[in-house]
Amino acid sequence: MLQPKRTKYRKPFLQSHDKRKAHKGNKVSFGSHGLQAVTSAWVDSRQIESARIAATRSLGREGNVIIRIFPHFSKTSKPIGVRMGSGKGSPEKWYTPVKVNTVVFEIQGVSAERAKEALRLAGHKLPVKWKIIEKEGVN
């Protein structure tokens, strides 16, 4: 699963996912096809990993899956049955905010039909609505 090696702060303040459109990372850069978010949400490292596995299993040994997002923020939680107070809980999960129009995954090295099918399978594992886009200038 994806998580940072080191962070400046172990427990960040709670932030809301930004509902504005992304102006960086909103085009297909490395592959031929991409999975672009239509809504915004927090995406967990486990969701990213399950989407990656779904896409790579669909492709087999051909092609590459490129992950364009990384979970930098930790989500803290306290154990079940612990009363309120006595500090903040320990980090449990890692999240990343995904803005509207952010390209989440890219695929290269396969035909358009196989790339679209792999991205469709990966998109169903994510908590955002999505669409499949092609690289500009590639048919």
From Swiss-Prot:
Top-level taxon of the source organism: Bacteria
Any single biological process term in GO: translation
Protein keywords: Ribonucleoprotein, Ribosomal protein, RNA-binding, rRNA-binding, tRNA-binding
InterPro entries hit by this protein: Ribosomal_uL16, Ribosomal_uL16_bact-type, Ribosomal_uL16_CS, Ribosomal_uL16_dom, Ribosomal_uL16_sf
Molecular function GO terms recorded: rRNA binding; structural constituent of ribosome; tRNA binding
Basic residues composition bias: residue spans: 1-11
Keyword Ribosomal protein: yes
Record-linked Pfam families: Ribosomal_L16
Record-level GO cellular component terms: cytosolic large ribosomal subunit
Chain positions covered by the region annotation Disordered: 1-30
Protein role: Binds 23S rRNA and is also seen to make contacts with the A and possibly P site tRNAs.
Similarity field: Belongs to the universal ribosomal protein uL16 family.
Quaternary context: Part of the 50S ribosomal subunit.
PANTHER family listed in its UniProt record: 50S/60S RIBOSOMAL PROTEIN L16, LARGE RIBOSOMAL SUBUNIT PROTEIN UL16M
Protein name: Large ribosomal subunit protein uL16
